[in-house]
Amino acid sequence: MKKYIILHLSLILLVFIACTDDQKQDDKNITFQRSDFKVRKSLSGKTIEFDSLILRPSQIQLFDSFLVTCNQGAEKQFHIFNLNTAHKEGECIPVGQGPKEMMTPCFVNRNDSVVIFDMMTSTIFTYSIPEFTSGKEPEYASRISLDTKPLWSNIRSLGNGFLGVSYQETSPGFLFDQTGKKTMDFGTYPKTEQEYTPAELINAFRADLTTNRKEKVAITHYFTDLI
């Protein structure tokens, strides 16, 4: 039996200055299977041997010519490597709840600056790339505290604001403006004939998401073939 994946693309127009009931969301459902992918491409690369151990990062991100790894549980969680020189430039961001510390950080999808979401404190930090990759403890350019807590998962940039996984029964996601204020619930859980309690619904359709940073969102539900 062929397995199908339902791609749920949500096209949205965001107005963060005045969030009203006029905000609309257009849904388009597409069903595809593996044989629909007609073009195959091979990827090739080269091995870079750095002068320091990479350890076991849970996340990696490229910023210009720098590879930044996130090692949750290490004394300093972000390690910076120069791809051109294969040299480790330094480490930064210690574990903690101080103003320059983080507990459970994750990268936000930006390439013009370094944006990091601390899940434990529901706080978004923004740094300039030169500042973050300097090899010293960076000074953040902005620090945004989300007004709806906690968000125990992914945050993605969308328009002038952010979209995060809610872990609430009302909707799988929350939209926030650039100040961290929640503007609306986003999306709906898949319909099913089985009845769930709120906790069962959240666990049955645990979500993760990604965006193109502009107007398109893809939400995937763990333990299903739904996107």
Residue ranges and their predicted role:
Residues 83-85, 129-132, 177-181:
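Short loop/turn segments that connect beta-strands within beta-propeller blades
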Residues 15-18:
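C-terminal motif of bacterial Sec signal peptides marking the signal peptidase cleavage site
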Residues 45-77:
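Beta-strand-rich domains and repeat architectures in extracellular enzymes and scaffolds
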Residues 28-55:
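A short helix->beta-strand "capping" segment at the edge of beta-propeller domains
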Residues 87-121, 141-146:
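Blade-loop segments of beta-propeller domains
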Residues 120-123, 127-161, 166:
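Asp-box/WD-like beta-propeller blade repeats and closely related beta-sheet repeat scaffolds
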Residues 41-46, 87-96, 134-146, 183-191:
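Beta-propeller fold detector
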Residues 56-63, 105-110, 152-158, 201-214:
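Structural signature of eukaryotic scaffold interfaces centered on beta-propeller domains
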